[in-house]
């Protein structure tokens, strides 16, 4: 049992509508909108990812973000790892899912942008646990399409598999990532 109620998913039509994309874009500070080069902006509260380049919108996707207690970190980061056909390691149990296919929790692509080696105390749904060592946050696909639009992950940003494939092809190591509340 989670210690708090999970936020409801954003209505699917709102998450997918071009109006919500334009509202998200308009809500950005001008210096973010006009930043040179290609960069990713994650609007965590809107559960929306934007890929901008020289002030132009290149891609926009609905996403899932971290659940209460596992919030996706905010701040300025950069892509430091890209993996085609990643291996998933459960952040609590250490269980590895190496086989690729429809059940891999990371989908077909992984794009890492944040690493935290301070450890943390977090709730796993049933109890409080302590995680020692490093955790990495990134963008990845999901076999669970129903999760997109919700705050439901362990901190990572989930996209539909077809969307993470497109994003993977558009970013490189060093691409700037800004995560806003």
Language-model regions: role of each:
Residues 1-181:
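N-terminal pre-domains immediately preceding structured catalytic cores
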């Amino acid at each position: 049992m989670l210690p708090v109620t999970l936020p409801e998913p954003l209505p699917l039509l709102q998450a997918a509508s071009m109006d919500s994309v334009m509202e998200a874009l308009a809500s950005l500070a001008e210096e973010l909108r006009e930043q040179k080069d290609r960069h990713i902006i994650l609007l965590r509260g809107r559960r929306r990812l934007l890929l901008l380049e020289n002030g132009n919108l290149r891609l926009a996707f609905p996403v899932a973000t971290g659940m209460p207690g596992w919030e996706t970190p905010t701040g300025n980061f950069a892509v430091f790892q890209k993996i085609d056909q990643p291996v998933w390691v459960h952040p609590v149990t250490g269980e590895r899912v190496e086989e690729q296919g429809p059940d891999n929790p990371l989908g077909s692509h992984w794009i890492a942008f944040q690493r935290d080696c301070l450890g943390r105390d977090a709730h796993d749904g049933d109890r409080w646990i302590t995680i020692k060592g490093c955790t990495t946050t990134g963008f990845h696909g999901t076999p669970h399409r129903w999760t997109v639009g919700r705050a439901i992950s362990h901190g990572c940003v989930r996209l539909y598999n077809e969307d993470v494939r497109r994003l993977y092809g558009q970013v490189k190591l060093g691409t700037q990532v800004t995560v806003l509340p």
